[in-house]
Amino acid sequence: VRFDGLKMAVLVTSGLALGGDHIDQLIFKRFVSPHLGKGERWVRRVDGAVIETEFPFDEFEALLLNWPVTYTLNQGKYRSKIRDGIQQGGAAAEKFQRLEELISHNLSYRVFQAIRSAKAALSTTAETIIDVPELDLSIALGLPEFDDLLQDLLAQIETLIDQTLARAGLNQSDVDLVIRTGGSSLIASIRLCLEARFPGRVVVHDPFTSVAAGLSIASYYGHEYDPATTIER
């Protein structure tokens, strides 16, 4: 955005269709799913023969990640596979039992609450815990592991910044101010990415309400938007 007195020109708009929920799902898949049976062996008897394969966790994971529909995993075609996993015993049985309890008590949303709390904690500390006592689940999560999880996302952000500046006809040095907004802007690696590219020019103010508040302030002071200057994504 370029300001000239009370007039503002949006030079270019662009963005990634990835938000905090996407990051929460990445955390679930990498750090939580292995504690629910992902990657374990599945032993069952079919027509008198003992068959062993990898447990088909992919059938469960999509519904676990979309917590409003996790209850649909209560169907027999899913529960029977979990029962096989529990009955086979061994170290994996505890994980399958945990998966059974998550589904029976519809605890996916509770797991995501714990993930969001841990993610927020990593904005200010180097290590935290994904803690879900209802499932006897406590997973240590450190900043290095979290940063590694975000590498693809950070690369996309870097590319998007380059593309946005190019389309606006600007260099990094032409940018006077970068405003961090939204919960994901509090993530340490994203903050450091922006500060490395725009040193001394990155600010944050009320990341969860700044967009709505900014529009209200702009309206109060009579700022005018000229849509003719905008380059769409």
Residue ranges and their predicted role:
Residues 2-134, 227:
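Phosphate-binding glycine-rich/basic clefts of nucleotide- and phosphate-handling proteins
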Residues 14-19, 137, 181, 185, ...:
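Alpha-helix capping and helix-loop boundary segments enriched in small/acidic/polar residues
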Residues 17-18, 173, 191-216, 225:
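Conserved phosphate-binding/catalytic loops in two-lobed NTP-binding clefts
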Residues 20-25, 93, 108-112, 143, ...:
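Amphipathic alpha-helical transducer elements in NTP-driven molecular machines
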Residues 38, 220-233:
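A polyampholytic, Gly/Pro-enriched intrinsically disordered region
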Residues 100-108, 135-164, 168:
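Adenine-nucleotide phosphate-binding core of ATP-dependent small-molecule kinases
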Residues 103, 107-110, 173-194:
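Glycine-rich phosphate-binding loops at beta-strand->alpha-helix junctions
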Residues 114, 118-121, 149-178, 193, ...:
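Phosphate/ATP-binding catalytic cores across multiple sugar-kinase/actin-like superfamilies
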